[in-house]
Amino acid sequence: MKLNKLTIAVAAVILVAVYFCMNRLTQSPGRDNSILENAPAQESESRAGDTPDARQTQQASDAHGTRNDVAAALPQGKVRIRIGLPKPTFGGTPREIKGANNLEPPRDGKPYPPIIVPEGCGTLLSLECKVTSSDPDPILGELSYITDGEKEWDSAAYVELAPGTQWVQIDLGQEREIHGVCVWHNFYEPRVYRDVVCQVSNDPDFIDDIVTVFNNDHDNSSKLGVGKDKEYIETNEGRPFPVNAVKGRYVRFYSRGNTANEMNHYIEIEIYGR
């Protein structure tokens, strides 16, 4: 009888030991497998910021301050000039724009088309270049503001020139090949600047060797020739336009007042090329 009890006790111990061993053998792989199975899921979650939707969101965020982050593929050997935009600033009650009968069609919030140029032809050439003017003593501001790289609107950071047809001229320092231009007048409120003309030359007096690359003076009121370009409402986008590889050292901009007042204003001019 004692032997039977001892045998039973030993058997019970063996059974308990076998039970625990079997339990560990069945549960341990399960735990290991669950870690391995969860690892890809966790890795996937950690990469959630690299999904196509997230990349598009990041691209949209990156493009908030630029005009030219467009997803369309470009021809080989072509690049898009990336023009940084200042924040929009429309102050006060918008004035009625009168007498603007040559306006470009409404863009309904769409940006201007990007300026596409050959590789190596989209360098900003005008930064901190010397600026001269038909009004050498501006009413407000300094001529150097026009190429200082500061495009944000500020009541003390733009240039105001006298009424009538006035010009500002940028000296690029040497002959350059120009492929694109963007000009910002005063975009504090919607307005149209009259007779906006851009010319390029190697002659600092603009008597000879003149190429007109933009002209919206439709009635020749500034005596620079009749232009085929359209007037436009000033916004924080400025007015970008392509230039067909015109060579010259000097770039001159004309204007003749605006629909808000008789003055001529400039915040920044950017010239791109090589």
Question: How does the language model describe each region?
Answer:
Residues 1-27:
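Sec-dependent N-terminal signal peptides
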